[in-house]
Amino acid sequence: MLLTLGACAPFGTATVGSTRVHALQDGVQPAVSEALTNIEPARLKEALHAAGEADPASSPVNAYVFTLGGRVVLVDAGGGSALPPYQGQLAAMLRSAGYAPEQVTDILITHMHADHVGGLLDGSAMQYPNATVHVHAQEAGFWLSPALPERAPAQFRPLILAIQSALRPYTQAARVRTFDYGAEILPGIFAQDAGGHTPGHTVFLWKQDGAQALFWGDLIHVAGVQLARLDVGTRYDSSAPAAAQARQRWLAASAREGWTVFGAHMPYPGIGTVVADGDHFRWVPGPAVP
């Protein structure tokens, strides 16, 4: 595996093949462990303590940017102003990495929760006016349905409306492109089925210069708990059984293949590898040198 970690950068960087990837932290979500499901409170406390995590545990919100064949690619867009005061740093981080929002040509969306798409907006305008937003067809159909706000529980309506608002200027400008699982979105980047957390949750498998990497979105929210208990999900999962199956499938594949992993909610910069350890997995942050 070809991966190096930028030791002197003010933010995390890694090299996959010949391409440098910058990790961008949009912010931190507090008390995410309180949203975990299928685990008793006492067991949760034990798991957090054993992993050295705070109780309740917070979760970073990571996105990634890189240049590929003359295109500037952003994986997820953070929460922006949709989730104040905890998020909204992504555009500033992007500039620190040497990119202007106007340079971004493609945004790969793992799923359309607000902490991944809210940052598409700058006020009411497109934060990335020259970008095409790529999202799974079923995911877009679900979240952009005009009937969804009325069908949803009242406490979720503000977030749903924020999600729809974030995509609206891009859809109006014909800058949303949908895909199906298995599609090659950009050269060497393939959309893969990880549905369960949301209807069209997607992981992106990237094959570049003999190296392979996986952007796994929200497979894991609290690493210290879920790597050991793959059946533990969150109350935001659209299908807890499907989400657990996706976790098992993609963690096992990551460990087996030795992929570089980029995790949206893994400890910043969210770059590492996965190692099988009996019936569960361990996260190894940073570089893995062949």
Give the ranges of each region predicted by the language model.
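Bacterial Sec-dependent signal peptides at the C-terminal "C-region" and cleavage site
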Residues: L3-F11
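Conserved beta-strand hairpin/beta-sheet module of binuclear metal-dependent hydrolase folds
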Residues: P10-A97, V203-I220
